């Protein structure tokens, strides 16, 4: 589902460049991006050989919290492909062997 109007306030959406997502629908009234409705996503825990975990602060999402790499799957992508793409987009790292440790629906 692709939004034309904000589901919260009804304002017509504009196209705005948002972080590493590129241009996307954005509610200038609510000050938030509206992602296409797609039910599957990934959350990736990225750790190095010392077991140090990468955390992100994405100000366009929240200025108060850190988060793990995450993102919506694109049509036709596997969870592993999504994890590789999102880690590349958000951390600038290349991962070669992503491992699925669990799923939840």
Give the location of each predicted region:
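Acidic, metal-coordinating catalytic segment for phosphate/diphosphate chemistry
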Residues: 1-44
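Conserved Nudix-box catalytic region and its N-terminal flanking loop in Nudix hydrolases
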Residues: 47-89
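Active-site segment of metal-dependent pyrophosphate-handling enzymes
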Residues: 72, 92-105
């Amino acid at each position: 589902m692709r939004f034309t109007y904000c589901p919260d306030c009804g304002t017509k959406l504009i196209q705005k460049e948002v972080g590493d997502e590129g241009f996307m629908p954005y509610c200038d009234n609510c000050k938030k991006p509206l992602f296409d409705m797609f039910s599957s996503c990934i959350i990736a825990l990225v750790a190095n050989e010392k077991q140090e975990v990468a955390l992100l602060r994405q100000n366009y999402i929240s200025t108060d919290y850190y988060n793990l790499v995450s993102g919506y799957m694109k049509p036709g992508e596997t969870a592993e492909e999504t994890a590789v793409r999102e880690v590349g987009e958000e951390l600038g790292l290349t991962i070669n062997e992503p491992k699925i440790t669990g799923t939840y629906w």
